[in-house]
Amino acid sequence: MKAVIPVAGAGTKLRPLTYTQPKALIPIAGKTILSHIVDQLSEAGITEFIFIVGYLGEKIQDYVKQTYPNLTTHFVYQNERQGTGHAVELTKQLIGDEPIFVALGDTICEFDVKEIIDSPDSMIGIRKVDDPRDFGVATIDENGFIEHLVEKPAIPKSNMALVGLYKINETAVLFECLQQLFVENITTRGEYNLTDALACMIQKGTRFRSFKVANWFDCGKKESILETNATLLKKMGGHVPAADIYKDTIIIHPVSIAAGCTISNAIIGPHVAIGPNTTITQSIIRDSIIGGYTNLHEVVLDNSLIGSDASVKGLSRSLNIGDNTEIDFG
């Protein structure tokens, strides 16, 4: 089975961070969004991955090759953003009629990957939400099979949202339905959506069993990324390198600090993730994500996203700043 991960989006809601790095490479709880997804799938036995890249795709390609040299990886470019259905269709030559596992590259979910992979059924991940109008929505029968799928309905018939996880055995039917979308120009909000192709498959007789995820973390905007960071740090317990000594510093767990950081006269935590080789002095950092190779001096930060290679001095507020930025309030 091959994994297909669409990561071509520009992540406009996360600017300025995404001006210089793709959304999938934003760190959460000590590792990138993409690594949370790839690690989960590879640990379950998937060894071949197809990444659909676009915006800053070369950065994703470099990251994957450096981080996962033992995996078989392919990169397909989606030069025009025409939706998830269009993205998956670009992988046709690499997939053939083999089964695939599709995981959208901007969400982190907790579920038993091995159980889903080993199941003989095609399967779609779902989660109950209060307002499903911005998601694909599933109607499910009493046996757990999906009866209907609709992408972003104005009036949803259920509150079961699609979480972006799809195990598809009948890939020949999938690509047939994707082609039908293009020929008949079937779009939702101007895009060819995978949900519409899956609905077509159901109409042609394909049966999808639903599976519920334990947790579903949206990584599409600053607030949800910080919430996800806090939740995952609580679950994982964080990590602080034993060899590093932080002078006159209080660590309030859960916290994740990468190797090579210099921290002194500071209070760090709770719910803080810090990238490698960052220097923090005379500062208080809470509920924030700090990139690598960054310098913070005399700052008090709450609910902040700070990119890599940034410098912030003399500040007390919530920030969202990108890479290679220098801010001095002294």
Residue ranges and their predicted role:
Residues 108-185:
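Conserved core of the sugar-phosphate nucleotidyltransferase
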Residues 10, 106-107:
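Active-site metal-binding loops of divalent metal-dependent hydrolases
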Residues 2-5, 13, 27, 31-103, ...:
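Conserved N-terminal catalytic core of the sugar/cofactor nucleotidyltransferase
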Residues 50-54, 126, 289, 305:
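Short internal beta-strands
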